[in-house]
Amino acid sequence: MAAMKTSDIRAMSPDQMDDAVANLKKERFNLRFQRATGQLENTSRMREARRDIARIKTIAAQKRDAKK
């Protein structure tokens, strides 16, 4: 899965953002496990997943603050 685009994230509802973060956290767990066992081929995906989570959380906070 490629890095998520900001425009795609902004189009998500808050529930979709929560689901996306949960899925990315599961993916990060699996990637860490693969790295530990020496099975991870695409090491850059760990960085992408971490940054996708941060990107989603940042946009969610911006939306939440904009409502106030």
Swiss-Prot record:
Record GO biological process: translation
Gene Ontology CC terms: cytosolic large ribosomal subunit
MF annotations from Gene Ontology: structural constituent of ribosome
Top-rank taxon: Bacteria
Pfam families xrefs: Ribosomal_L29 (PF00831)
Keywords: Ribonucleoprotein, Ribosomal protein
InterPro entries: Ribosomal_protein_uL29, Ribosomal_uL29, Ribosomal_uL29_CS, Ribosomal_uL29_sf
Protein family per UniProt: Belongs to the universal ribosomal protein uL29 family.
Name of the protein: Large ribosomal subunit protein uL29
Organism: Nitrobacter hamburgensis (strain DSM 10229 / NCIMB 13809 / X14)
Lineage: Bacteria, Pseudomonadati, Pseudomonadota, Alphaproteobacteria, Hyphomicrobiales
